[in-house]
């Protein structure tokens, strides 16, 4: 937190072969505040600007960042982190343990959308200027994995700018401005238009990129984004529309990079609401409180048809809240419900809805790949068994407030576990919402099961891999039996880039400028 001279900042040499790099995506990051909004567009973007104690490498493994090393504390009390010396924030101030303690207090505060990350944490204490101890409520063997996206802010800069706590609703100085330790710094921010970044000359790590200026532009119209890539107006777009991928890939000047994301797309329900809120049956008792109705939804949605016609074979069917590539995926529960309209109708009749019912389906139209088209298909499929959905699709900046205000009967959600572990969605999506315990913060529908709640701390504390997997298998089976959510598919990755660009495609869909090279 001590300030350095400008001359000291200029010691780092600029990368050789430097160029300007422009890229586009469908969603503009909602904020520059790393603790305000827990969403991939925000966290992915800000991982270029801010850093955590640990980070993910090219192979997605955890590696040192602002902490040079770490070790478990005695008796499983927590973890001790030894901080990197000589690190500076982009304004020249020095990073130390005070910034870590402050960033914990800020990111775990009730005002922060990331506070659920710290549910297993009881305290963070400074040992000395470059050592911190993070105390956990129980032994937590995967804790370092869980903080890869926890970004450290400069305590003095944040407080002096009046942004001591995040404010995702009204915004503050940190909403439009940033001061991280990462490889790039924000030099211009026009929400919804452009965000410009330049290399942080005082960055502590070895520079691998060749970028001297990077410019991000949100482009929601897919045809416009493709045209910008093909014309060379931008060097990279994410995503390439599925229907255009083959055509784009035929062009010699561009390349389509394909992969499978860690994100599962699913349908969620208003478990807690006593009545329906939308459609002709608004005010009537809520059918989704009955597991048979939720099972009917699972049998009514023709996932193979969605994969074939909308996702063009690029996605994979999902059976759980995590994909098969994630640690803790339950092999015994890998089978998803069959498409069976007759079974869906029978389940509805058994639940007392032989003629079906009307309700509302909320959906984003610029957050996930083909999200609105998927919701339109779901509406048609549900109608065939008597469930008449009123679709309300909207931009993501309007979508999250609607979900947090409980303005839905059913909704579409995508989830990518930040830890790449099956414990993650149990903590965020399946545990009973508990603001004080910082659990269930994305469980918008209020699903609640005492067994799941009791299993979570045992899963978090279990050191034996086999015992832990057995508990995760039990949790996956219970969530399937309850049909807490209806997993649909694992979302594909389709990035388009000019052929002279090399980069790393991460399965969490985070785009890292520090690996971009333009020849």
Language-model regions, residue ranges each:
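Ligand-site clamp/hinge motif
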Residues: 201-247, 291, 379, 388-390
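Surface-exposed binding/hinge segments that line
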Residues: 116-163
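Alpha-helical secondary-structure segments
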Residues: 22, 96-103, 129-131, 135, ...
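Structural transition elements
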Residues: 316-350, 367-371
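Extracytoplasmic/peripheral linker and loop segments enriched in polar/acidic and small residues
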Residues: 286, 291-295, 299, 307-308, ...
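Acidic-aromatic pocket-rim loops
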Residues: 37, 260-279, 398-460, 507, ...
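N-terminal lobe/hinge region of extracytoplasmic solute-binding protein
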Residues: 24-74, 105, 179-183
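Gly/Pro-rich hinge or "lid" segments in bacterial periplasmic/extracellular proteins
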Residues: 149-209, 213-215, 341-342, 346
């Amino acid at each position: 937190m001590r300030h350095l001279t400008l001359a000291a900042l200029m010691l780092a040499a600029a990368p050789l072969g430097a160029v300007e790099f422009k890229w586009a995506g469908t969603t503009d990051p909602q904020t520059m505040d790393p603790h305000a909004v827990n969403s991939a567009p925000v966290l992915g973007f800000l991982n270029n600007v801010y850093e955590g104690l640990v980070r993910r490498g090219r192979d997605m493994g955890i590696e040192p960042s602002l902490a040079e090393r770490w070790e478990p504390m005695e008796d499983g009390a927590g973890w001790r982190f030894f901080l990197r010396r000589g690190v500076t924030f982009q304004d020249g101030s020095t990073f130390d343990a005070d910034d870590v303690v402050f960033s914990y207090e800020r990111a775990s505060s009730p005002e922060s959308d990331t506070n659920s990350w710290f549910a297993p944490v009881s305290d963070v204490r400074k040992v000395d200027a470059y050592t911190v101890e993070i105390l956990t409520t129980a032994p937590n063997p995967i804790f370092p994995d869980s903080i890869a996206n926890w970004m450290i802010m400069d305590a003095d800069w944040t407080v002096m700018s009046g942004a001591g706590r995040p404010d995702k609703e009204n915004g503050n100085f940190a909403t439009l401005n940033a001061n991280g330790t990462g490889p790039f710094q924000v030099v211009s921010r026009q929400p919804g238009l452009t965000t410009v970044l330049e290399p942080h000359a005082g960055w502590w790590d070895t520079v691998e990129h060749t970028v001297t200026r990077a410019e991000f532009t949100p482009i929601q119209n897919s045809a416009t984004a493709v045209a910008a890539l093909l014309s060379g107006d931008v060097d990279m777009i994410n995503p390439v529309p599925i229907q255009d991928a083959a055509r784009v890939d035929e062009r010699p000047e561009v390349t389509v990079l394909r992969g499978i994301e860690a994100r599962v797309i699913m349908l969620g329900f208003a478990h807690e609401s006593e009545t329906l809120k939308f459609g002709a049956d608004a005010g009537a008792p809520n059918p989704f409180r009955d597991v048979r109705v939720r099972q009917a939804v699972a049998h009514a949605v023709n996932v193979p048809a969605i994969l074939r016609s909308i996702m063009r074979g690029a996605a994979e069917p999902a059976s759980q809240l995590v994909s098969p590539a994630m640690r803790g995926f339950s092999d015994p529960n890998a089978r998803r419900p069959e498409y069976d309209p007759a079974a869906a109708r029978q389940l509805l009749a058994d639940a007392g809805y032989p003629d079906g019912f009307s309700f509302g389906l909320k959906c984003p139209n610029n957050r996930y790949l083909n999200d609105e088209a998927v919701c339109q298909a779901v509406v048609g499929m549900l109608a065939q068994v008597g469930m008449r959905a009123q679709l309300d699709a909207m931009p993501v900046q309007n979508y999250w407030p609607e979900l947090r205000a409980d303005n839905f009967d059913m909704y579409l959600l995508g989830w990518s576990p930040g830890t790449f572990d099956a414990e993650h969605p149990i903590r965020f999506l399946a545990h009973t919402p508990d603001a004080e315990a910082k659990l269930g913060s994305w469980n918008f529908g209020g699903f609640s099961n005492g067994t799941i709640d009791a299993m979570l701390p045992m899963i978090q504390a279990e050191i034996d891999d086999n015992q832990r997997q057995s508990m995760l298998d039990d949790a996956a089976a219970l969530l399937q039996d309850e049909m807490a959510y209806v997993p649909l598919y694992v979302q594909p990755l389709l990035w388009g880039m000019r052929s002279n660009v090399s980069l790393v495609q991460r399965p969490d869909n985070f785009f890292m400028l520090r690996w971009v090279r333009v020849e």
